[in-house]
């Protein structure tokens, strides 16, 4: 559909409320930028880059915002391939602190597959939603001044760029944050789970495998036992737990007892508490393999742990209401909540500021992390769905900005789900300090 909301007749008529007129203008602004947004997405898609190496995607996005009036750009924000673009409404007085809304862009790709997770579309949606919100606020004055920030967040697939930015203070004064991820359906929430990566290294002793194998200590045997130990463990794992890995190094030649082997595993569970339990069980499997073979084992993690995404029901409900106005058909709540998803460093963001991480259909039933999804993410058909999602995000942001009670409910949801997640029904100073989100701080 075009910039209009369904049923709006294509014009901001007198019957529309001020808020609905703002939403109409947001959708129109996004549609006006459709060609340039498509070019941005296509440019990123056609030149895939791995985590922390997204030089060309970074250049494309920073050039995009530097060419638009009113945006203040920090091209290398905290990380080489991160950026920050800001736009603000005029301050009405010196006492009014602006409501700070964030939109996140991802743009790293997968090894050998390119943009098989559609991060080019995530970048496009984040940029589009920010422009839509800007366009709406240029036509109407919200109750309080507003600051819009677009954060370019590298390295979601490997490393956790958002976690680096959290630690650098990038989210400290934000009230609410938005991003959306491509998938096979529209869903306001899917249970993205907590994830821990572990690298397992076994050190043995080389020897001639035919002449005197008894002199060797076989590190490959340790790796195979470890892999099989994890496979056996799955019988006793909860249905919502996941452990998957590869053997990265298993020796150099058949007639040499391998003195070194290496595995890499990802462990996932619905919550940080459950992830800790799974990690303990997995570590026991790795250590048992070392004991059985006489190898020395070394366990390490190459990056940050990803937290599970905390659901903000108020934001999700508001997003669904706006999405339905645009023709979205959302997955049933029971199906979405009982489905299994992956992991994202947005989960860590959801622990420090209220936010939403919906999923959106792109016109294909292909599965993420496949060659077919790479093709779908770069298709012309995906553009309609990406821009529709951006409109829904911008409209949801407008609801938050123009309805103080809604923002209060968003904050209450955030506080409650954090307390439930932490298993602590008493707000401590530590949890206040770590909340990060300006809108929900105790002050």
UniProtKB/Swiss-Prot annotation:
Pfam families: M20_dimer, Peptidase_M20
UniProt-recorded name of the protein: Peptidase M20 domain-containing protein 2
GO molecular function: dipeptidase activity
Source superkingdom: Eukaryota
Residue intervals passing through the bilayer: none
Family: Belongs to the peptidase M20A family.
InterPro entries: Bact_exopeptidase_dim_dom, Peptidase_M20, Peptidase_M20/M20A_hydrolases, Peptidase_M20_dimer, Xaa-Arg_dipeptidase
Entry-linked SUPFAM superfamilies: Bacterial exopeptidase dimerisation domain, Zn-dependent exopeptidases
